[in-house]
Amino acid sequence: YPAREGKDGKPYSSATSTKLEAGGNWVKNGDVTDDWGVIQLNSNIGNKVGWLGLKYQAGAYTGNVTVAGYPRDVRGGYYFDNPYMFKHTSAISSDDKWRMLYYKNLDTSAGQSGAPVYQYYADTGYTAIAIHRGQNNSTNVGVRIHEWLFNKLVSYR
């Protein structure tokens, strides 16, 4: 349900999956640098609700990043199907060619893996630069969108 807000807030109806794809090295041997997935939908819902920009760059990213998603541990409960979107922003602590680390004060939990990690750019608006993959005690981590992954993601549009 794109733009879902609450139990009944479904302004764009629904879309269903027609194809699933995941990073081959993640599937074969759990390689965390290839931990990404794509769900192809039965409609071009992005033509109705808009598209999040995508970007890759060779150099390091700086500044803040935001993660938005539907965490499971919200509003005093633990939901399998949380209907409320939350977003948090934090500084990038480090990144390299394959991964990006951002500080723990960017609150994420189970259910947000696969969410976009994004920044705002004047020329492209809100733009995904990584894919959230998880957290540990002090840091969140995302898979950076590098050139090959950028081209793969764009091919689904």
Question: Where are the language model's segments positioned?
Answer:
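Catalytic nucleophile loop of clan PA
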Residues: 106-131
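Short glycine/Trp-rich loop-beta-loop segment that forms part of the substrate-binding cleft
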Residues: 40-46, 52-81
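Acidic glycine-/aspartate-rich tracts in secreted/extracellular proteins
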Residues: 3-7, 42-46, 71-73, 122-124, ...
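Conserved catalytic-core segment of clan PA serine endopeptidases
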Residues: 1-47
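Short beta-strand-centered aromatic/proline hotspots
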Residues: 83-93
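Extracytoplasmic
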Residues: 34-36, 62, 99
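Short Gly/Pro-enriched turn/cap motifs at secondary-structure boundaries
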Residues: 27-30, 74, 105-109
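C-terminal cap/linker of serine protease catalytic domains
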Residues: 129, 133-157
